[in-house]
Amino acid sequence: MPQKTSQNSLRNVALTASKAYRTKEGITVPEWDGAKVTLREPSGDAWVKFREIVNPQLAEGEEAPTLTEAEKFLRNKAADVVLFIDVLLDENGERVFSDEDQEQVSKIYGPVHSRLLAQALNLGMSQEEAGKP
């Protein structure tokens, strides 16, 4: 039977930043000399930035430009980097990168980063968990 939480205790837990997201701790990254990282699901702010990159706002009557495959790849990579720098945490639960690191991370972003991002995205709530059809 779950332990009953006092109202004050519940409030404190609900206001704890480290408990605002699902996390996956102790992930070993062999390609990074066996470094251990923590991943969390992306924040709402990161999702907004992601969507702004993938679907930039157009002026009224303006059509979205047709992108080449290379342009689509670069756009999608830039959007993924925004999420990646948001979800990668060190063993203490602190972000490894700041938003200012986006350009630097984008230059080296590869399959290892992409696999870690995929794990973080899987922490998000499924439609079944949200009770949606």
Residue ranges and their predicted role:
Residues 1-24:
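Extended acidic low-complexity intrinsically disordered regions
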Residues 23-33:
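Short acidic-hydrophobic surface loop/beta-edge motif
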